[in-house]
């Protein structure tokens, strides 16, 4: 059992705490699942892009799935090799494309014909051949939250089969494009294996057709999306996921690229917060804590439910339903409704569980609240991996503008 009390002697709440041993094991589980075939596990930085987490994964020979030039430079800074980096995203700017090509990353996942011709023009100006992959939208329902579904025709991501074929043929004829991969990603927090296998089989069939047309594919990029159990719900077994994809690739000599994010880091993270007040309003019990929706947005944005437990001794206190809420001036600043918690006092400490993914990476300074301290637990030792922002950091980049006032 981890001794939180020692932690509270040196660090004030709220803060994030990550168990690096859990991250390491989660990544190694992916490597083991795909070991029967040439594969590259590209961690999706969007889930959590802390440099120390990236460095840990770099030492395990992880690749990186990046969706901005900032994420690419983060990956490189942490030691991930350029030839293990893929650049995804529906809205890459010309500057980002140029930088990515100059850095000689593995390839760019292309989302539209217009983006393809933009990459071609930039590659021509640089006098190089751009390695590209085309993201195919298989029009398959991932059966997940609509905000994180990406594989239906009404979603903004990828292109249909007909347009993908036209794009591949265009790239094949171009002196400045080199099509090396097919790509799909139907959504995040997936709990049903069937849509993933269906998409994999559909795109594998397309890949075979492309190879028959003389397109020299080398990679099969399956995206990510395996969900984690936030509320004890059924999740996809990694072995079944890997075997389903491997079976769909029979007859294809391609390296599999998998882009997990949430399933690598989610369960490693805790948000430690303390009670400021208890209040009752018209017989409704509220527990007000010092963390807010700016620190952890998922419950407010997705109505996501994360278990909350009390780590301050509370034996003998009466348990009753309550809403755990933050101090931000929004009614949506709620971490959990109808949580069954004991009567709490100011200073009592709570843990919000499984916040390693899309926690700190989605945090903001809303309400002029500094971003949180982040700590790592590794080999039974605690170290700081991101300092808490100071109040002065909130306006540091704005001070120059005051000189003209």
Curated annotation (Swiss-Prot):
GO biological process: lysine biosynthetic process via diaminopimelate
Pfam families documented for this protein: Orn_Arg_deC_N (PF02784), Orn_DAP_Arg_deC (PF00278)
GO-annotated molecular function: diaminopimelate decarboxylase activity; pyridoxal phosphate binding
Binding site for substrate: 262, 298, 302, 330, 358
Residues annotated for pyridoxal 5'-phosphate binding in this entry: 225, 259-262, 358
Location of the active site: 329 (proton donor)
Catalytic activity, as annotated: meso-2,6-diaminopimelate + H(+) = L-lysine + CO2
SUPFAM superfamilies for the chain: Alanine racemase C-terminal domain-like, PLP-binding barrel
Keyword Lyase: yes
Pathway per the UniProt entry: Amino-acid biosynthesis; L-lysine biosynthesis via DAP pathway; L-lysine from DL-2,6-diaminopimelate: step 1/1
InterPro entries the record matches: Ala_racemase/Decarboxylase_C, DAP_deCOOHase_LysA, De-COase2_C, De-COase2_N, De-COase2_pyr-phos_BS, Orn/DAP/Arg_de-COase, PLP-binding_barrel
Enzyme class: lyase
Record keywords, A-Z: Amino-acid biosynthesis, Decarboxylase, Lyase, Lysine biosynthesis, Pyridoxal phosphate
Cofactor: pyridoxal 5'-phosphate
Entry keyword Transferase: no
EC annotation from Swiss-Prot or TrEMBL: 4.1.1.20
Function of the protein: Specifically catalyzes the decarboxylation of meso-diaminopimelate (meso-DAP) to L-lysine.
Membership in a protein family: Belongs to the Orn/Lys/Arg decarboxylase class-II family. LysA subfamily.
Protein name (record): Diaminopimelate decarboxylase
Protein source organism: Helicobacter pylori (strain ATCC 700392 / 26695)
Designated gene of the protein: lysA
């Amino acid at each position: 059992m981890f001794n939180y009390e020692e932690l509270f002697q040196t660090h004030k709440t709220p803060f994030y705490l990550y168990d690096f041993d859990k991250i390491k094991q989660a990544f190694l589980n992916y490597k083991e699942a795909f070991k029967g075939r040439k594969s590259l596990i590209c961690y999706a930085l969007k889930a959590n892009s802390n440099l120390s987490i990236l460095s840990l994964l770099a030492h395990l020979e992880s690749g990186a799935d990046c969706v901005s030039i900032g994420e690419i430079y983060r990956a490189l800074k942490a030691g991930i090799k350029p030839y293990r980096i893929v650049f995804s995203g529906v809205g890459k700017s010309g500057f980002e494309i140029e930088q990515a090509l100059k850095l000689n990353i593995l390839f760019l996942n292309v989302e539209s014909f217009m983006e393809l011709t933009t990459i071609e023009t930039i590659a021509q100006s640089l006098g190089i051949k751009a390695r590209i992959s085309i993201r195919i939208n298989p029009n398959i329902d991932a059966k997940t939250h609509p905000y994180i579904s990406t594989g239906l025709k009404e979603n903004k991501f990828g292109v249909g089969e007909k347009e993908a074929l036209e794009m591949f043929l265009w790239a094949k004829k171009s002196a400045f494009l080199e099509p090396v991969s097919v790509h799909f990603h139907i959504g995040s927090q997936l709990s049903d294996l069937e849509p993933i296998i269906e998409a994999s089989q559909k795109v594998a069939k397309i890949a075979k057709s492309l190879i028959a047309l003389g397109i020299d594919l080398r990679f099969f990029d399956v995206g990510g999306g395996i969900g984690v159990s936030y509320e004890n719900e059924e999740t996809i077994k990694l072995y079944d996921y890997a075997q389903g994809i491997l079976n769909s690739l029979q007859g294809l000599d391609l390296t599999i690229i998998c882009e997990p994010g949430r399933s690598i880091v989610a369960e490693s993270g805790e948000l430690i917060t303390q009670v400021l007040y208890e209040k009752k309003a018209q017989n409704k019990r509220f527990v007000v804590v010092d963390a807010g929706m700016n620190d952890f947005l998922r419950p407010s944005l997705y109505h996501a439910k994360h278990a909350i437990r009390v780590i301050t001794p509370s034996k003998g206190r009466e348990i009753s339903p309550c809403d755990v809420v933050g101090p931000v001036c929004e009614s949506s600043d709620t971490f959990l409704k109808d949580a069954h918690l004991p009567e709490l006092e100011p200073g009592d400490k709570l843990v919000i569980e499984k916040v390693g993914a899309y926690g700190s990476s989605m945090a903001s300074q809303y309400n002029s609240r500094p971003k949180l301290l982040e700590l790592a637990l590794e080999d039974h030792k605690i170290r700081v991996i991101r300092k808490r922002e100071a109040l002065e950091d909130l306006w540091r980049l704005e001070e120059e503008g005051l000189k003209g006032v």
